[in-house]
A protein has these predicted regions:
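Charge-rich, low-complexity N-terminal segments
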Residues: 1-34
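Assembly/interface hotspot detector across virion components, adhesins/toxins, and nucleic-acid enzymes
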Residues: 7-8, 58, 71
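Alpha-helix boundary/N-cap detector
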Residues: 8, 32-42, 101-104, 108
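Acidic, glycine-rich loop-and-strand cores that form catalytic or ligand-binding grooves
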Residues: 27-65
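Helix-coil modules at protein/domain termini and other flexible surface or pore-lining loops
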Residues: 52, 74-76, 87, 107, ...
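Short aromatic-glycine-(Arg/Gly/Cys) micro-motifs in beta-strand/loop hairpins
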Residues: 63-95
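Short, compact, well-ordered microdomains
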Residues: 85-126
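Short acidic DE-rich linear segments
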Residues: 128-135
Length: 135
């Protein structure tokens, strides 16, 4: 079965990984403005782990493509760009947990879990963000 048919929510990802969706990071002692981003990051890592179906990036393999969702704000509002190591390069021996095994999964996650990405990336959603201006 296509994993994108199976993982449509954080709860679906938890079910696929045998995790309790109610077991979220404890953020009560953190500043209020940081809490939502910490929980969103955790949820994204769970979702991405489920979508990747056990695949983990090999950071020693320079020939293995790894896909990330990149976002930026321009004067028109919130925008999206997909990249991989063929388009841009960063050297690290510690991997990103927000890494996908293929571009299809990266795009799917960006479209399906956009609100989690926004919670992770911004303390406040920019007022110039227009949900209809996806690139």
């Amino acid at each position: 079965m296509d994993i994108t048919k199976k993982i449509k929510s954080y709860e679906d990802a938890c079910k696929a990984l045998n995790l309790d969706p109610a077991n979220l990071p404890v953020v009560d002692n953190l500043p209020e403005k940081d809490r939502k981003y910490i929980v969103a990051y955790y949820k994204l890592t769970v979702i991405i782990r489920a979508l990747n179906e056990g695949w983990e990036p090999n950071w020693q393999d320079w020939d293995e493509y790894k896909y990330f969702n990149w976002f930026y704000i321009d004067f028109a509002g919130f925008a999206y760009a997909l990249t991989n190591c063929a388009v841009s390069y960063a050297n690290t021996y510690f991997g990103s947990r927000l890494c996908f095994k293929n571009a299809t999964l990266a795009r799917y996650a960006r479209e399906t879990f956009e609100s989690l990405y926004l919670d992770y990336l911004f303390i406040e959603i920019p007022q110039t963000y227009n949900n209809n201006s996806k690139k």
